[in-house]
């Protein structure tokens, strides 16, 4: 695997009963790259992400990660996380009865649950929440936050996991323009730190604004991969 590549998927196929969801798909993510993943509903975007993160198994192919000896198989989202992959799905998967701060740390510091407050959070986590304008909600229960705020909290949690690869599954669908811009600022900072980002979106204008490359799926096939700067403006 090339030195600048953080993630590589080769010849990945996945079949559900009566449906060929992915057919011999290749995908490469470079370090410090924001890579858009686009396609119509049913194209295979969600399946690709779920194969990568261990939600689904796959029939053929291999996944390679920077720093791993040989191919990896993620049998669960927890294994994917151990390999340095953090994912934020469109449907937020957090604990509504815990505070924002507790959700940021859950799964890593279980002894602190029920004791975490704004003052116990480390400087990095504090700065991260501030950058997304959710610092004032740190001691609020998640269920008291809007859907958009919950999405930003899920993004903050994923970023705080110190990942090599960050997968954002349509993260802007519930955000307003100001929140989208704050997210893009954060994505650019992560890019500068060498994090590879997979950005699933239906909005081509957002691809022009923040992405380096784009991969297009159709009916389970990869139909094109292009540098964004070479795309015609439409």
Explain the meaning of each model-derived region.
Residues 2-234:
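Glycine-rich phosphate-binding loops of nucleotide-dependent enzymes
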């Amino acid at each position: 695997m090339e030195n600048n590549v953080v993630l590589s998927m080769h010849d990945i196929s996945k079949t559900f009963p009566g449906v060929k969801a992915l057919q011999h798909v290749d995908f490469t993510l470079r370090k410090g790259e924001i890579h858009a993943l686009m396609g119509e509903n049913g194209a295979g975007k969600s399946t690709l992400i779920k194969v990568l993160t261990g939600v689904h198994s796959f029939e053929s192919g291999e996944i390679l990660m920077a720093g791993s000896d040989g191919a990896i198989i993620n049998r669960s989202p927890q294994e994917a996380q151990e390999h340095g992959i953090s994912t934020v799905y469109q449907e937020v998967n957090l604990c509504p009865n815990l505070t924002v701060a507790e959700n940021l740390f859950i799964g890593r510091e279980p002894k602190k649950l029920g004791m975490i407050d704004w003052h116990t959070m480390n400087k990095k986590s504090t700065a991260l929440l501030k950058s997304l304008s959710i610092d004032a909600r740190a001691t609020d229960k998640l269920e008291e936050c809007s859907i958009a705020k919950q999405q930003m909290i899920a993004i903050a949690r994923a970023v705080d996991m110190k990942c090599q690869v960050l997968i954002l599954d349509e993260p802007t669908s519930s955000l307003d323009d100001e929140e989208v811009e704050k997210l893009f600022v954060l994505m650019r900072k992560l890019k500068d730190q060498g994090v590879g980002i997979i950005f699933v979106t239906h909005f081509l204008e957002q691809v022009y604004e923040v992405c380096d490359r784009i991969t297009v799926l159709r009916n389970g096939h990869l139909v094109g991969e292009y540098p964004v700067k070479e795309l015609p403006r439409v």
